[in-house]
Amino acid sequence: MAWDMCNQDSVWTDIECAALVGEDQPLCPDLPELDLSELDVNDLDTDSFLGGLKWCSDQSEIISNQYNNEPSNIFEKIDEENEANLLAVLTETLDSLPVDEDGLPSFDALTDGDVTTENEASPSSMPDGTPPPQEAEEPSLLKKLLLAPANTQLSYNECSGLSTQNHANHNHRIRTNPAVVKTENSWSNKAKSICQQQKPQRRPCSELLKYLTTNDDPPHTKPTETRNSSRDKCTSKKKAHTQSQSQHLQAKPTSLSLPLTPESPNDPKGSPFENKTIERTLSVELSGTAGLTPPTTPPHKANQDNPFRASPKLKPPCKTVVPPPSKKTRYSESSGTHGNNSTKKGPEQSELYAQLSKTSALGGGHEERKARRPSLRLFGDHDYCQSINSKAEILINISQELHDSRQLDSKDAASDWQRQMCSSTDSDQCYLTETSEASRQVSPGSARKQLQDQEIRAELNKHFGHPSQAVFDDEADKTSELRDSDFSNEQFSKLPMFINSGLAMDGLFDDSEDESDKLNSPWDGTQSYSLFDVSPSCSSFNSPCRDSVSPPKSLFSQRPQRMRSRSRSFSQHRSCSRSPYSRSRSRSPGSRSSSRSCYYSESGHCRHRTHRNSPLCARSRSRSPYSRRPRYDSYEEYQHERLKREEYRREYEKRESERAKQRERQRQKAIEERRVIYVGKIRPDTTRTELRDRFEVFGEIEECTVNLRDDGDSYGFITYRYTCDAFAALENGYTLRRSNETDFELYFCGRKQFFKSNYADLDSNSDDFDPASTKSKYDSLDFDSLLKEAQRSLRR
């Protein structure tokens, strides 16, 4: 059906309306036309309007969290937002229409200073206070409604094709009453006189206008660069505006800025609309309104592009294809504008889906920015202090990456022409303008904060290494099948490694004998390879089971192989069925230890980890005196090794017994030869060296021993080399006694050396002996009784 929104010069067709609200969504019949002629400024309630915005801001954060947590219901929720999109379509369409230039100076007076955005400078005023006509800005729809007098019709004469963006919450739908739109000539003198007469009435609504047009960031800087032509000025302002909007999209997922004055494709190149400045954006940023939500830290990065910006007008009208954001998508300053026939927009290309996909996709302005920006923000704003929210979100993001990459393969061909329209000169100029604008936007406080963050991040990277080189294992094991298929070299280089400095590592490396060999083995030279290349190896004998890491060939061609380590050990141990490994990282690539070592290359992006729970690789605690018991491939090998150990033990015991017997034979021989002297009653503090030195005067001593007892009866044995020396010591040994010592007891060994105290001193303790216990019944009888007893026994 045809939908007449303006006059007879521009008519919207079914295809254009379907492109705005969705391919499968019909236009709502309850919004046929709007009649704004009877709208009075006094009927507007600014307090309730601002309160509604605050309520929407509070609800937007909750809904955005729901979208982030429930990505599976994205398409169902997008369909519910289409009704709210109609109001955005009407607002954006009506705002794009030109009005007379006489009413613009009053808006500049109202919005001077407080309302000006950070990326736009207020138009320079003439001496009489009026701005140049080509620099004039058009008021938005709400401005027109607030500033229009009672019973006055607003004038429109043009409308243009638009590309809509979803900016309404699906829980609070906006409904409008049916009305009739009445048009009149926009350049009539009647409209000019009305606008000039109503200037005093615009002042009471200045606070509302400031509230609607002021961005979050304070307008503390203004661009000072003067441009040679209005064409260059228009392009640079659009670029700066796009950059400021990208900051809001980066920090707040629910924020959206709509250009209120998209240029008409029917305007000729020499029309006065070509030289006019871009209209200030009506920031429908419910979550970004100052004072409504807590501030976001750290400062937003200003160097990231906005994938939802409108293309500026550089050439005659042509069709524009808006691809969804993805890792391969590159956005440049397109020369085409929105034509009459806009391409239809599927539900997967809405802003909400794009925002969710943006967190898991990579996009870079290679032609504009000459740099890549990672959009897979796994660590929040600080890469070194925050960890991954949950393992489920990682899996969701990875699956969305693969889904987006498959969809873009068929759509990149249609958008190649858009990337080639901007020449290198324009790109360099845009890049310089964007860089200068971004440098002016940073406030002194935020600059100091960014400097501190960079210093802290540099120190941490210097000590621990870059976060992209850290090890992420748990999600890698679960998602290795997803990465094995659709990752090319470009995608692999853009994909940052999952850093999990504080994440628990369940899948561990196993030990291996040939780990150094596996580290030097090159990868296969295919273009598409898996993120985690599995190449396990298990040794055959006397070696635990290990898995190896195979860095890519390109890494070793660029720099020599260097293995770095992090001094981080984990004290998690396994049960007895598996060895109690302590996880550590080794300094040497070829070092082998009983711990599981996590190796990684300095510039490598690939990590490999598999866990093998094999009975042959199970380690048990050993009872042997060795550090660990070796492993065997077969029972026969185990039996053979056990017999060898038993044989060695028997041989050792046999040798020890032979040595003991030999010493005993030598002692007995020395005793028989009268070469061993027993020395008794020595001091308890006498040492073997002292006793040897004192008795060595009689001859050469082969052996000297001292035995100390608790009761003080200490003694020693001295073995001489010759028998004559032993006899000399036995005869003259008493002369060695000192004045404070008792006389030595000197004997030849063999008589008292094996005596014990209970044997030698049986009668020393007479109290312990009871003679009554040894008496029999006959001891208590007299002689007569004994005689009678004897005779009685004989009679038997």
Swiss-Prot record:
It comes from the Eukaryota. Residues 675-751 form the RRM domain. PROSITE patterns: RRM. The lineage of its organism: Eukaryota, Metazoa, Chordata, Craniata, Vertebrata. PANTHER family: PEROXISOME PROLIFERATOR ACTIVATED RECEPTOR GAMMA COACTIVATOR 1 PGC-1 -RELATED (PTHR15528), PEROXISOME PROLIFERATOR-ACTIVATED RECEPTOR GAMMA COACTIVATOR 1-ALPHA (PTHR15528:SF10). The modification N6-acetyllysine is found at K77, K144, K182, K252, K269, K276, K319, K345, K411, K449, K756, K777. This is Peroxisome proliferator-activated receptor gamma coactivator 1-alpha. Transmembrane segments: none annotated. Residues 217-235, 477-486 have a biased composition (Basic and acidic residues). Transcriptional coactivator for steroid receptors and nuclear receptors. Greatly increases the transcriptional activity of PPARG and thyroid hormone receptor on the uncoupling protein promoter. Can regulate key mitochondrial genes that contribute to the program of adaptive thermogenesis. Plays an essential role in metabolic reprogramming in response to dietary availability through coordination of the expression of a wide array of genes involved in glucose and fatty acid metabolism. Residues 114-127, 242-258, 332-344 have a biased composition (Polar residues). Residues 291-337 are annotated as: Interaction with PPARG. GO terms for molecular function: chromatin DNA binding; DNA binding; lncRNA binding; nuclear receptor binding; sequence-specific DNA binding; transcription coactivator activity; ubiquitin protein ligase binding. GO terms for biological process: adipose tissue development; cellular response to oxidative stress; circadian regulation of gene expression; energy homeostasis; gluconeogenesis; mitochondrion organization; negative regulation of neuron apoptotic process; negative regulation of smooth muscle cell proliferation. It is found in: Nucleus; Nucleus, PML body. A motif (LXXLL motif) lies at residues 142-146. One of its GO terms (cellular component) is PML body. Phosphorylation by AMPK in skeletal muscle increases activation of its own promoter. Phosphorylated by CLK2.
